[in-house]
C-alpha cells in the first residue's frame, strides 16, 4: 500500500509500505524482452493487416471494417510499448515525464476496451451473417459498421478517461525513484473500486458472455448444416476454430483481470500483506504480456481465417502491387455455410447453402 506524504515541484511525494514488491531482477530482464517481441511481432502483423485490408481488399465488407479498426487500435498501443519496456528495464523508474505517463497509460486502457468491443462486434456480425443471413442483410451494411466503430472508439476513449486523469508521476521517497502509477487517497474508495469493476465487467465479463453466446449459436447452426451434408471433417475444423477463439480470449484475459482486482484491494488497504503484494506486482506485468500479445495477434489470426486474405497477404510479401479495382471480400471458414430459405418459401424446410463471403 502506498501512503501520501507531500507535494513538491508539482510531483507528489509518497511512501511505499512494500518497496520491494515486484522488484526482481528476472522481471527487469524478462518483461522488457517480452515487450520487445510483442512490439516487433505486433507492429509487423498489424501493419500488414492494415495494408492488405485497406489497399488490396478495398474495405468492402463489414468484417473487414472491424478488423481494420482492431489492427489500428493495436498499432496505437504498440507505439507506446517501447516506453513501458524502458520503464521496466530501468527497474520501474519513469524518465519520460507526466504527460507521456498519462498518454501511455491511456493507450493501454484504450486498447483494452477498443479491442474487446471490436471483437465482440465481430462475433455478433459473424452470428448475424451465419445464423440470420437473409434477415441481417439490410442491417449489416458498411455504414452501420463504420458508425459502430466510431461509437466504439468514443466509448473506449470515455472508459479510458479516468486512467488518463488519475495516472500520474510520483516520487517514492523511501526508494528514491520516480514512478508512473495510480495513487488513491485512503479516504476515497469509490475511484479504485469503480475502475476495477469497470475493467472486470465492461472490459471482460459482458464481452466474453456475448462472444461465447454468439459462437455457440454459430456452432449449433453450422453443426446442423454439416450433419445434413454429412461433412464430419469440416464440422470438426469449424469446432476447433470456434473453440480456439473462445478459449484464447478467456485464458488470455482472465489472469490479468484477476490480478487487476487484487491490485485494487491492495490499493484500498484491504490487503496489507507484503508477500501477497509481491505476488501481485510480480504477476501483473506477466499477465499484461499474455493479454496484449494475444490482442496484437488477433487481427492477423482473424484475417488468416479467410482464403482471400491469405492470397493478398502472400502477394504483399512478394511485392505484387494491389490492382486498381478489386471485388474481393473477406471470407472466413466460419461463414462457409449458412441457412437460406428454400425456394418454395417454406421456412420449416431449409437446406445448407454456400456463403463464402462476409458481406
Swiss-Prot record:
How does the record classify its membrane topology? Multi-pass membrane protein
Looking up Gene3D superfamilies in the UniProt record yields: Rhodopsin 7-helix transmembrane proteins
Annotated lipid attachment (S-palmitoyl cysteine): 355
Among its keywords, does the record have rRNA-binding? no
Keywords assigned by UniProt, alphabetized: Cell membrane, Disulfide bond, G-protein coupled receptor, Glycoprotein, Lipoprotein, Membrane, Palmitate, Phosphoprotein, Receptor, Transducer, Transmembrane, Transmembrane helix
Q: Topology: which residues are Extracellular?
A: 1-25, 90-98, 166-190, 269-278
Which CDD domains does its entry note?
7tmA_AT1R
SS bond partners: 18-274, 101-180
Fill in the PTM field for this protein.
C-terminal Ser or Thr residues may be phosphorylated.
Mapped to this chain, the residue ranges on the Cytoplasmic side of the membrane are 56-61, 126-141, 217-239, 305-359
- Annotated angiotensin II binding sites: 15, 17, 167, 182-184, 199
Biological process terms from the Gene Ontology for this record are: calcium-mediated signaling; immune response; maintenance of blood vessel diameter homeostasis by renin-angiotensin; neutrophil chemotaxis; positive regulation of cytosolic calcium ion concentration; regulation of vasoconstriction
Where it sits in the cell: the answer is: Cell membrane
Q: Which SMART domains match?
A: 7TM_GPCR_Srsx
CC annotations in GO: external side of plasma membrane
Extract one GO molecular function annotation from the record.
angiotensin type II receptor activity
Q: How does it assemble?
A: Interacts with MAS1. Interacts with ARRB1. Interacts with FLNA (via filamin repeat 21); increases PKA-mediated phosphorylation of FLNA.
Q: What name is this protein filed under?
A: Type-1 angiotensin II receptor
| Organism annotation | Ovis aries
**Top-level taxonomy:** Eukaryota, Metazoa, Chordata, Craniata, Vertebrata
Amino acid at each position: 500500500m502506498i501512503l501520501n506524504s507531500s507535494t513538491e515541484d508539482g510531483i507528489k511525494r509518497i511512501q511505499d509500505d512494500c518497496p520491494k514488491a515486484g522488484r526482481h531482477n528476472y522481471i527487469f530482464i524478462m518483461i522488457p524482452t517480452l515487450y520487445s517481441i510483442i512490439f516487433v511481432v505486433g507492429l509487423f502483423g498489424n501493419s500488414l493487416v492494415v495494408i492488405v485490408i485497406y489497399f488490396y481488399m478495398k474495405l468492402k465488407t463489414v468484417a473487414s471494417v472491424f478488423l481494420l479498426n482492431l489492427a489500428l487500435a493495436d498499432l496505437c498501443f504498440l507505439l507506446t510499448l517501447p516506453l513501458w519496456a524502458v520503464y521496466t528495464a530501468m527497474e520501474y523508474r519513469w524518465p519520460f515525464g507526466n504527460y507521456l505517463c498519462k498518454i501511455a497509460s491511456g493507450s493501454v486502457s484504450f486498447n483494452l476496451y477498443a479491442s474487446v468491443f471490436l471483437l465482440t462486434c465481430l462475433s455478433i456480425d459473424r452470428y448475424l451473417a451465419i445464423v440470420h443471413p437473409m434477415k441481417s442483410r439490410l442491417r449489416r451494411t458498411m455504414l452501420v459498421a463504420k458508425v459502430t466503430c466510431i461509437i466504439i472508439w468514443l466509448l473506449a476513449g470515455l472508459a479510458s478517461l479516468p486512467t488518463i486523469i488519475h495516472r500520474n508521476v510520483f516520487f517514492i521517497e523511501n526508494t528514491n525513484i520516480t514512478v508512473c502509477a495510480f495513487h488513491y487517497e485512503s479516504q476515497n474508495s469509490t475511484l479504485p473500486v469503480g475502475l476495477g469493476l469497470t475493467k472486470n465487467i465492461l472490459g471482460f465479463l459482458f464481452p466474453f458472455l456475448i462472444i461465447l453466446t454468439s459462437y455457440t449459436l454459430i456452432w449449433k447452426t453450422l453443426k446442423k448444416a454439416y450433419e445434413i451434408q454429412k461433412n464430419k471433417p469440416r464440422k470438426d475444423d469449424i469446432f476447433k476454430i470456434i473453440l480456439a477463439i473462445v478459449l484464447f480470449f478467456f485464458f488470455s484475459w482472465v489472469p490479468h483481470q484477476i490480478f487487476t482486482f487484487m491490485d485494487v484491494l491492495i490499493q484500498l488497504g484491504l490487503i496489507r500483506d507484503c508477500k501477497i503484494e509481491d505476488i501481485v506486482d510480480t504477476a501483473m506485468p506477466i499477465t499484461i504480456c499474455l493479454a496484449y500479445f494475444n490482442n496484437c495477434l488477433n487481427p492477423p489470426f482473424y484475417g488468416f481465417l479467410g482464403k482471400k486474405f491469405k492470397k493478398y497477404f502472400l502477394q504483399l510479401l512478394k511485392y505484387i502491387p494491389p490492382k486498381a479495382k478489386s471485388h474481393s471480400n473477406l471470407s472466413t471458414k466460419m461463414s462457409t455455410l449458412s441457412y437460406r430459405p428454400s425456394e418454395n418459401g417454406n421456412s420449416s424446410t431449409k437446406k445448407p447453402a454456400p456463403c463464402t463471403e462476409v458481406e
